[in-house]
């Protein structure tokens, strides 16, 4: 593994979404949002469980009606991951899901009602120890801010966020996190930079409405990557017009790429050329699918020839360097074996699983020794 100086994260206060710590140095949480009808309890539960399986720390669920709130009660009883209820316009829905054990409320104080209604929601959240996320979005800025600035700007998003923060400050409530999302990468990044200088609360990162699976992943990687590399951000969501499971995968890929939080295999693979001695692309695609269940952090390099292969293998947990008929296998930088190119996928899967088990056992022993 390549050595690098750790990113110095912005200091923030600590809140808890269910049992997940947010801020104050806690691991950056990766979350997604269901796209089922919340009133379809079975479909929503199945999607949440699919998100849990790929590592989601938190899942947000839209609760637009009282019927959805009743469904939320049933959903909450069937899943383990903390749930955030996304509430707009009707403060009574927030009060209802609070009764049903919601782990966090995502509200916009600007559309939830008057001061008295906001106070009722905040008092309920305080009594039940439920944090709140203030969610500001460039696409739904208050009309007076639209008129003042003419268009969404970083200053407009900041002013909107601070207006809502002031709502909670006046009510002496500090268990909250804030987001200032936009679909434009530069607008979102600058808005978060400004906000990070103004408040101490945790920040939830996102490039909203980023696009489809490919373009949305690229936009999110650029925007979130810039902020995370500057130490800004305590939770994140990659917003894609795609299966929410992909949001979690891309989120962890961003964190892995920045070496902020490792989960699963970090594949290093060449784009291939006429020098490749085996099917690199097919091997990588197959292994990514077969090894999705592996959560052990490890770097695996799969290089088709001897130009860059040995160098990458030296800094990988496991590395393959393409050779004629057989390819070299490296473990922790040391050449260990040769693999038959015609059976590369099965052999490499077996070696990776064995290495993951070995690393897991070593960590288990380390934990036991520390506990003693």
Swiss-Prot record:
Enzyme class: oxidoreductase
Keywords on record: 4Fe-4S, Iron, Iron-sulfur, Isoprene biosynthesis, Metal-binding, Oxidoreductase
EC number of the protein: 1.17.7.3
UniProt cross-references to Pfam families, sorted A to Z: GcpE (PF04551)
Tagged with keyword Plastid: no
GO BP terms: isopentenyl diphosphate biosynthetic process, methylerythritol 4-phosphate pathway; terpenoid biosynthetic process
GO molecular function, one term: 4 iron, 4 sulfur cluster binding
Top-level taxon of origin: Bacteria
Cofactor, how bound (note): Binds 1 [4Fe-4S] cluster.
Pathway the protein contributes to: Isoprenoid biosynthesis; isopentenyl diphosphate biosynthesis via DXP pathway; isopentenyl diphosphate from 1-deoxy-D-xylulose 5-phosphate: step 5/6
InterPro entries assigned: Dihydropteroate_synth-like_sf, IspG_bac, IspG_bac-typ, NO2/SO3_Rdtase_4Fe4S_sf
Keyword Iron: yes
Catalytic activity, as annotated: (2E)-4-hydroxy-3-methylbut-2-enyl diphosphate + oxidized [flavodoxin] + H2O + 2 H(+) = 2-C-methyl-D-erythritol 2,4-cyclic diphosphate + reduced [flavodoxin]
Family: Belongs to the IspG family.
Function: Converts 2C-methyl-D-erythritol 2,4-cyclodiphosphate (ME-2,4cPP) into 1-hydroxy-2-methyl-2-(E)-butenyl 4-diphosphate.
Protein name: 4-hydroxy-3-methylbut-2-en-1-yl diphosphate synthase (flavodoxin)
Gene label: ispG
